[in-house]
Amino acid sequence: MTNKKFQAINVVFYSQWDSYEKWKNILLKQNINLYQWPDDFIKNKYYPNINTALVWDPPEEMWKFFPKLKIIQSLGAGVDHILNKSYPKDAHIIKLSDPNLSNQMADYILMSVLMCHRKIFQYSINKKNKDWNQIIPFDKDNFGITILGYGTIARIVIKKLKYMGFNVKVWSKTKRNPKNIQYYYGSRQLHKSIKNSSCLISLLPNTSETNNIIGLSEFNLLRKECYFINVGRGMTVNEQELIYALSNAILSGAILDVFSKEPLNKKSKLWGLNNVFITPHIAGITNATDFTASLLKKNFHALISNKKIQNKIINTRGY
């Protein structure tokens, strides 16, 4: 590969949720050419000049038309929408790590924790019953929080929760070296990290090792009054066991932003549970930003210069 051959950054864009026009205008400022799939392409024609993709949940049949693809940039923090299908194995997959997105998700988690801590679910029920009844919130010292996953977002959340006076534990699949935090890692320490917490927060990605990692066995380890918050991936939770736990007072409530199948089926029992707060995968909403456009350009030039690429995922791990 020579630098001259790949100086132009030509990007194929696909997303049913993100604005092509906004991304096109942002990328043009970085001299990056953006083309929308399938609108800007002739059917069944190959495009070797396209070297980069910017996508969310792309159809796998599109990849064959771009034989020289080198970078696939996800439009979200997760990459399972790429890895769970056939994709160009020679391409480097990049997760979106935009400070704006990370802070959005951190804010959502803080909101959720406070809703649980102040028992807002019960007030919602009281409102329907026109019941004027004051409820004593949890003592923060007795409202332990366990976070599953220790990435960028988790680190932001931990810092803010500790500043607010909450006791926080964290678990990750692989060993890290966090400071000033009760830390657990590996499958053998998962249950130890959850035991006696009042609030379980999942930031886990969807991989073969995290699929259905959370279920009744984990919920039963929590305190009597306890809550579950999921902003990671829906496939990490056994949804039927979650419904059972919520229906049988094993969990006092749940705040759910992600589900095993999205949109959430209208027949799902989760919709009818008073102790569940549902949002449609909006904890972090991707915006077209100069930060991401600049990072896309930097990563492309890093690739052709044989330098380190930022936010590259390890395909075998899934994150």
For each feature predicted by the language model, list its residue ranges:
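N-terminal glycine-/charge-rich "phosphate-binding" loop or analogous flexible N-terminal tail
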Residues: M1-I50
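C-terminal helix-to-coil terminal segments
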Residues: T2, L96-Y108, Q122-Y123, N177, ...
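Short acidic low-complexity segments
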Residues: Q36-Y46, E60-W63, I181-N196
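Phosphate/diphosphate ligand-binding glycine-rich loop within oxidoreductases
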Residues: P48-S124
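Glycine-rich, N-terminal phosphate-binding loop of Rossmann-like dinucleotide-binding domains
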Residues: D57, G76, L203-L204, V231-G232, ...
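Glycine-rich NAD(P)-binding loop of Rossmann-like domains
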Residues: Y123-I156, Y183
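NAD(P)-binding Rossmann-fold cofactor-contacting core
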Residues: Y163-N180
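Rossmann-like adenosine-cofactor binding region
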Residues: K175-K269
